[in-house]
Amino acid sequence: MAGKFEIYKDKSNKFRFRLKAGNGEVIAVGEAYESKAGCLSGIESVRKNAPDAAVVEV
């Protein structure tokens, strides 16, 4: 099963997303957004910028 992004509202009624692996484990969580459109933009940013992201120890 492929991973998926889930959009939900938090306790403050803000939109957030979480990325779940194929096994259902949450592997990433986005910040709070005022609008669903902003949340969707955050998801698109992750999709665009992360496919070949380097792993860097800081």
Curated annotation (Swiss-Prot):
Lineage top rank: taxon: Bacteria
SUPFAM superfamilies reported in the protein's UniProt record: YegP-like
A Pfam family per the record: DUF1508
Residues passing through the membrane, by range: none
Family: Belongs to the UPF0339 family.
Name of the protein in question: UPF0339 protein TDE_0826
